[in-house]
């Protein structure tokens, strides 16, 4: 297995933020007098921009989904300003890849300001040579654009880059980019439909490091 790069999603992969994210969506839903089901959370995870707007308008039954999404992001950032919870194994895998000379990037649907704030708050910004926001590409996940851009920015071929994702939209994007796509499920287990798009499915980054060390591809 040849790999020269590693591209990380942010929410649910680097940081244990998905629960905060979901809680905030539910708070907003209650204010709009609606009850969200699991379908919304699955549809919204990993999206941004126009796709996020459409999902919000469909489930919230509002005419301005962009405004609701903006309010959600604002509230979430306020919560994260107090503490950015780093997921188990993240610091270890970053140090491991750095020792190996692997070039690393973050590719997240969140705004660049939010990504930079979270990375700095967690003290891990220095590991990454590039940070790509969903606002920088024409098409958001599940389109592959964000991972192709990240691979380009760190000077690596997509097929030689790991992509670490927790969402089905992200997995489809990583696979579409031709990357070695690793799903680390957070709150949503992989469906039978998305499993074929995963190179690996790992419980955490400790398992990722073990597989990389032993060259286990399946």
Describe the residue ranges of each PLM region.
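Asp-based, Mg2+/Mn2+-dependent phosphohydrolase catalytic module
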Residues: 1-4, 95-98, 111-218
């Amino acid at each position: 297995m040849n790999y020269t790069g590693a591209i990380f999603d942010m929410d649910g992969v680097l940081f244990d933020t998905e629960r905060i994210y979901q809680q905030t969506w539910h708070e907003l839903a209650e204010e709009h007098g609606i009850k969200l089901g699991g379908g919304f959370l699955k549809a919204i995870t990993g999206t941004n921009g126009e796709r996020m707007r459409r999902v919000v308008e469909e489930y919230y039954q509002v005419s301005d989904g962009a405004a609701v999404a903006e309010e959600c992001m604002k509230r979430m950032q306020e919560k994260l300003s107090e503490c950015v919870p780093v997921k188990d194994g993240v610091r270890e895998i970053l140090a491991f890849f750095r020792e190996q000379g692997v070039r690393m990037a973050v590719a997240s649907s969140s705004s660049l300001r939010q990504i930079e704030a979270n990375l700095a708050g967690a003290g891990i910004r220095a590991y990454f040579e590039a940070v790509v926001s969903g606002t920088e590409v024409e098409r958001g996940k599940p389109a592959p654009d964000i991972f192709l851009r990240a691979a380009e920015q760190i000077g690596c071929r997509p097929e030689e880059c790991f992509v670490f994702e927790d969402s089905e939209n992200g997995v489809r994007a990583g696979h579409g980019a031709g990357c070695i796509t690793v799903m680390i499920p957070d709150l949503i287990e992989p469906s039978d439909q998305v499993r074929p798009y995963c190179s690996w499915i790992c419980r955490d980054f400790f398992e990722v490091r073990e597989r990389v060390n032993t060259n286990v591809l399946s």
